């Protein structure tokens, strides 16, 4: 009820608590007490006290990459575990969202996280892996889909999106083709158009310019 609920009545997915190095909590953890010990037990922390609520359209792998990118840039570089460990974790996450991940990456992420949490010199380093660890534990299936199926269920990771045109909805107006920067869309006026996936750069211009909602992603 706080803040009016989730926009457009979309489904709740997770809430990230404690700032950039805080953990992500799922629906079953929403009744957790907001105190240090209670949050520590479930892999989160009070931190800055900020809450980021995420709906069903959020990619949890990208969330982990986003926060790891932030903390990696904030690392002072004084200690090796934080400086190099967060860099390695970020590289792995970037591979996964790009569709180049391997199943062994998940074990490596957890091993790196454990090492950083136990050996980093300051609070930033010790808490930096929390967004990654918490999302792997709660949303491992999403990580596996990115790695094995090369699919982002939220449609957020552009490298994993496949753009298609629904022939039933397409009116053949050619707006998508005219606005495609790489000429990947062809067809005849008043007939369904098609997308050449070998040329498509997944910019999303076709979706933005289709007045009939005929372009979609998988």
What would you call each of these model-derived segments?
Residues 164, 171:
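Primarily a LysM-type cell-wall glycan-binding module
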Residues 167-168, 178, 197-198:
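Short, well-ordered coil/turn residues that connect adjacent beta-strands
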Residues 81-87, 175-192, 205-218:
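Iron-sulfur cluster-binding cysteine motifs and their immediate structural context
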Residues 1-162:
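Redox cofactor-anchoring modules in respiratory/redox and cofactor-processing assemblies
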Residues 152-163, 182-195:
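Cys/His-rich short segments
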Residues 75-78, 169, 199, 209:
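Short pre-active-site segment immediately N-terminal to redox-active cysteine/selenocysteine motifs
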């Amino acid at each position: 009820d706080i803040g009016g609920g989730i926009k457009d009545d979309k489904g709740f997915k997770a809430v990230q608590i404690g700032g950039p190095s805080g953990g992500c909590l799922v629906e079953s953890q929403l009744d957790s007490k907001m105190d240090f010990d209670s949050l520590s037990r479930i892999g989160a922390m009070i931190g800055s006290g900020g809450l980021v609520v995420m709906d069903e359209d959020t990619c949890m792998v990208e969330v982990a990459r986003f926060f790891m990118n932030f903390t990696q840039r904030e690392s002072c570089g004084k200690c090796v575990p934080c400086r190099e460990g967060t860099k390695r974790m970020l590289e792995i996450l970037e591979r996964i969202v790009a569709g180049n991940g391997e199943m062994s990456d998940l074990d490596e992420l957890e091993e790196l996280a454990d090492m950083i949490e136990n050996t980093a010199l300051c609070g930033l380093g010790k808490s930096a892996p929390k967004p990654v660890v918490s999302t792997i534990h709660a949303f491992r299936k999403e990580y596996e889909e990115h790695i094995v199926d090369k699919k982002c269920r939220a449609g957020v990771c552009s490298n994993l999106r496949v753009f298609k045109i629904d022939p039933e909805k397409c009116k053949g107006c050619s707006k998508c083709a005219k606005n495609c920067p790489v000429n990947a869309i062809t067809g005849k006026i008043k007939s369904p158009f098609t997308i050449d996936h070998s040329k498509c750069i997944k910019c999303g211009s076709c979706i933005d310019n289709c007045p009939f909602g005929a372009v979609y992603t998988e």
